[in-house]
Amino acid sequence: TDHLGREVTIEKQPESFVSGYYISTSLLIALGLDDQLVGVEAKADKRNIYKLSAPELTELPSVGTAKEFDLEGCAALKPDLVIVPTKLKDSIPAMEELGLTVIAVNPEDQTKLFETIDMISTAADVVEKGQELEYWISDALESLKKSLDGVETPSVYLAGNSSLLQTAGPEMYQSTLIENAGGVNAASDITDTYWADTSY
């Protein structure tokens, strides 16, 4: 069951993936599956984490963004499994008509991040690696929490990449990162969007 509540049947262990979302791409790298990626989201060559951990990904075909996903380009890559953000829910029926197996993920808080790891590791038959990744993250968060004991909780404004007046709302994983680091998201009251426009 994916994050849209869809029951997805995977007939055989996938050997090739398309990831239309940087978080799922990063998780595929962490699970040791980057060599099975055949297509990734747009602007992969701009992400330093890819350049450092899996530079070959920057040369893969782009399947676009959540706003402009390249259905035909994705289908042409003939992946065994496509992983997309839930924002692309309206495009999934068309993907399935093209014969693609699709799971939709929304790893925008700690629980959903672990659910996404579970989904991907189960689909790829690397459950043990998925569990190891979750244990590693949990241990790191616990150590961080202990180090912050008694520290004052600051209000944090996280500016967007495209504008200093754009900030991450509480529906985004960036808000979880702020909380994990001992802060409070200054935009926590904005609940109707992901990136929110602000003014001064």
Positions of PLM-derived features:
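Short, structured coil segments at secondary-structure junctions
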Residues: 33, 56-58, 98-100, 181-182
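Short helix-initiation/N-cap motifs at beta->coil->alpha
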Residues: 3-5, 60-72, 190-200
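A short, structured surface patch at a secondary-structure boundary
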Residues: 19-77, 81, 87
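Extracytoplasmic substrate-binding proteins
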Residues: 7-9, 91-166, 184-189
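Alpha-helical, coiled-coil/dimerization segments enriched in small aliphatic residues
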Residues: 166-196
